[in-house]
Amino acid sequence: MWMFKQDSLITALEIGTSKVVAIVAELNESEALNIIGFGQAPSQGVIKGQIVDRKLAYEAIRKAVKAAELKSDLELHQVYLGVTGQHITSSNYTGSHAIASLDRCITDEDIDDVMSNARRFNLAQGQHMIHVIRQQFMVDGQRMINSPVGLSGSDLGVVLHAVQGYKDDLHAPVQLLRRMKLEAENIAFNGLASALAVLSPAQKAEGALVIDLGGGTTDFAICSRGVVCHSGVLAVGGDHVTQDLATGLGCPFKRAEDLKIKFGSAIVSEAARGQVREITNESGIMDRRVNVENLHRIMAERLKEIFAIIAAEMDRCDVADMAQLVVLCGGGAYIPEICTLAGKVLELPVQIGAAVNLHGPSTIIERPEYATALGLLKFGAFDMVRQREASSKIIPLKQRLKNLLRIDH
């Protein structure tokens, strides 16, 4: 067994609709993450990102975790757990605080007070707060990203982005992990994790929309000026594209999935018009013909709808002008011409995302379908160093790590 310090190990666990992924990494003294273990298993008992059959889900999680343990030659005890599902919502909240000191100089205590005021929002019954992310401060109405401590003013304001979900849905995977003698060290919304994985500091500053096209859900997050300004979940993903094909082409779901992978496209190209493919059965005998143009049209309609919903949400929340770039990840990023369609609907340049500032096999860190799990490693590193800092009181380190996505909770 490799000799790693337990307090330097981070395990990410993503329980998706199509797959369960566990990745183990070591956080070294220079705060670099090195991947040392990987496990994956087909998902079972999960629909639209939420566990519906605990027995099946337990077995899928167990297989992925055991594979990661075997690869890393470690016995795992804690994980950073990714969560998604349509029960997850987000909102922005504001708080204000009058500066009481005679010299009107803003102190750390003023920061604590205004943050406390902004957090005084009411959650719906049964909801649990997942993240509270500081977006910006305001001093006498003037917006600023960095800490205003030391500045003078009469009124201090803050804007927070909060992500919340329902306790029962969040606790379901945690309970399964405990049956395996695993503890959830912390949980993170998958959409934020994916953004952590694939965005560079410059992209976060300039503004980017990250869309993770999963099997059962599509998670998204918008970063601008270095912070998350909006996020959300659509209960629509790649499986819905497959179901549309199964219905439209009159074939079983599994056959539709094969056709999507082999012949799919997000746009209807000229080359596809009138094209017909002969499809063989398991015995190698041709049993049907498929109109490729029709296949592409069915896929394009569903994918266009997904991007259009996100565009409408951005307009509704007045954040459309904050993104200068779209980064796609998740398994859906492999669909041919997906960038072309996304760019047309969202009217922005589009690229496929790959993890940044991680060390490990290229077969893992460069694959868009692992963005969430890789982002969970970064979230875990942020959380781990924050805990170390809390005991050692190293203020500069704390401030530096808070800038990761300015997650205050």
Residue ranges and their predicted role:
Residues 81-86, 324-334:
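Glycine-rich beta-strand-to-loop/alpha-helix junction loops that act as flexible
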